[in-house]
Amino acid sequence: MRFLGLGLAEPVPDATTVWLFRQQLKQQGLIEELFEQFDRDLRDQRYQPKGGQIVDAAVIPVPKQHNTKEEKQKLAQGEIPESWQQKPHPLSHKDTDAHWTKKNDQSCFGYKNHISIDVEYGFIRPYQVTDASVHDSQVLGALLDQQNQGEEVWADSAYGSESIEWIIHILQFLSHIHEGVNRNHPLTAQQEEDNRERSQVRAKVEQVFGHWVNEMGGK
């Protein structure tokens, strides 16, 4: 309420109103411009990104689509069903960009928010939004903040691969990616200790996602 300049006695916009307003901003191509302005304002207030950065991703579910088998096949191919194109009103109520993914052995339909926060202040700096089927590691290169005054990067084991380590090295960052557990190759005592230390830092990004889960139904 304080952010919007609303008083205690004034009505608060409901979720639908906020969503419709955001859609208007999106259609006019203003989302990125507003976020960049917000980031500039943070820097002007001396909230420079520092201390390194933490990257992570969270699934944001949307209502499931009730589509026919033929419609699902078209959507899977990246096409809009012909019947929708002929009926603009139904099309406006269909989400043609969201996709399915698996999270903790449960199927989720929606999008995925990929973010990088600075360790010092915990503000979201670069971010990317994809459909839920995109793997966390696929957008790492776009998330790394070159303006962060720290060189260290923290991430969970979903980002653990030789190609990701190569990207981090090429961009001159220092990797603190969580060691993944392998059934045939258990972690050493040192690796477990390193993971505990990494988790203490990564807890900051979990707080950001915790808010999304509690307030917006993320996963």
Tell where the protein language model's regions lie, with residue ranges.
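DNA-recognition alpha helix
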Residues: 1
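Polybasic low-complexity intrinsically disordered regions
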Residues: 4-171
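Helix-centered, glycine/charged polyanion-binding patches within enzymatic domains
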Residues: 72, 152, 157-219
